[in-house]
Design a protein with these regions (language model features):
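Short, charge-rich, low-complexity interaction segments located
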Residues: 115-117
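Left-handed beta-helix
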Residues: 5, 10-11, 16-17, 22-23, ...
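Phosphate/pyrophosphate-binding betaalpha-module
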Residues: 39
Length: 117
């Protein structure tokens, strides 16, 4: 794991593997960030809220841009999320999906594998 200045990881959060955390990013309580099969990059000023799961498969890295909020209990799996985007609570974004900058993924939404928005 590589951390930049002012990064915060809550007690009870788990961050393992090939994970890069940008400046002023935060990982909140009970979130799991597992870069065990491919890298995970979390941009600066991004927050991963309580209970989120961020994971990867071989060939499907996870890249989260700057200024992103990933809402409580969301699951991001091997996808790309653009800058200044909100991933709503309980949303699921699957391998190879691409969410553009300045976007909103609704709470509880499912973004299927390989889709781009």
């Amino acid at each position: 794991m590589e951390k930049q200045a002012e990064t915060w990881i809550a007690p009870g959060a788990v961050v393992v593997g090939d994970v890069t955390l940008g400046c002023n990013s935060s990982i909140w309580y009970n979130a799991v960030v597992r870069g065990d099969s491919a890298p995970i990059e979390i941009g600066e000023n991004t927050n991963i809220q309580d209970g989120c799961v961020l994971h990867v498969d071989a060939g499907f890295p996870l890249k989260i841009g700057r200024g992103v909020t990933v809402g409580h209990a969301a699951i991001l799996h091997g996808c790309t999320v653009g800058d200044n985007t909100l991933i709503g609570m309980g949303a699921i974004v699957l391998n190879g999906a691409q969410i553009g900058k300045d976007s909103l993924v609704a709470a509880g939404a499912l973004v299927p594998q390989g889709r781009s928005y």
